From Swiss-Prot:
GO cellular component: cytosol
Biological process according to GO: 'de novo' IMP biosynthetic process; cobalamin biosynthetic process
Region spans: Disordered: 239-263
Gene3D superfamilies (alphabetical): ATP-grasp fold, B domain, Phosphorylase Kinase, domain 1
Protein name as annotated: Phosphoribosylaminoimidazole-succinocarboxamide synthase
Organism: Chelativorans sp. (strain BNC1)
Record has ATP-binding as a keyword: yes
Molecular function terms, GO-annotated: ATP binding; phosphoribosylaminoimidazolesuccinocarboxamide synthase activity
Keywords: ATP-binding, Ligase, Nucleotide-binding, Purine biosynthesis
Pfam family, one: SAICAR_synt
Pathways involved: Purine metabolism; IMP biosynthesis via de novo pathway; 5-amino-1-(5-phospho-D-ribosyl)imidazole-4-carboxamide from 5-amino-1-(5-phospho-D-ribosyl)imidazole-4-carboxylate: step 1/2
Reactions this protein catalyses: 5-amino-1-(5-phospho-D-ribosyl)imidazole-4-carboxylate + L-aspartate + ATP = (2S)-2-[5-amino-1-(5-phospho-beta-D-ribosyl)imidazole-4-carboxamido]succinate + ADP + phosphate + 2 H(+)
Amino acid sequence: MNRRRRIYEGKAKILYEGPEPGTLIQFFKDDATAFNKKKHEVVDGKGVLNNRISEYIFEHLNRIGIPTHFIRRLNMREQLIKEVEIVPLEIVVRNIAAGSLAKRLGIEEGTVLPRSIIEFYYKADALDDPMVSEEHITAFGWASPQEIDDIMALSIRVNDFLTGLFLGVGIQLVDFKIECGRLWEGDMMRIVVADEISPDSCRLWDINTRDKLDKDRFRRDMGGLVEAYQEVARRLGIMNENEPPKPAGPVLVSSKPDGETRH
């Protein structure tokens, strides 16, 4: 595939001009970052795993009627996506106390929350992505009240789906982060799920051992990041069961595509 014009490069992905108007190519890098890139390493194979896991999840979201920017996977590291106007918010949905919530409120990590909690963070690396309220969001025009309602409704639906998906393979969904975008279709606009959903953006614990299968392994210098991501892919049926782990180049089962926060 010929390289197209680079549109944007973030901490873990690069966006290129797509083959058709209104499309982009999303490339997954091997960079692992934490604390808004204060900690950074290149981890061989991470981008391939995140691309494949995110594809699997977004395909399922599309199938059950949760709108996303995802069109199809192009290769091991790239996806074709719809171009959207990103809402400058990171939406964090929490089911179990962990990370900044546990520290901020003095709650023991692992405590099941009374109900799922949705938090908003303003996307601004220079400010360390500060937590904001709905009042901030509407006052500064980052999103309208109706858009906030739509984002929260999508977040709840995604949480319901992911909780069941991971529970079925012995994984507890502690929390996750998504981004949303405005998708313009003629004169009509709707809010869709964008960015990625992968072990980079979710906290995932083995339901029996509580082993961490997510980016906390990198944040906390635990090691075994790629092996943990491979385990998630294996349980979801993405990795070949008979293939031993190879951190530098995981072997993935191909499929036919259907028609960083401080959290």
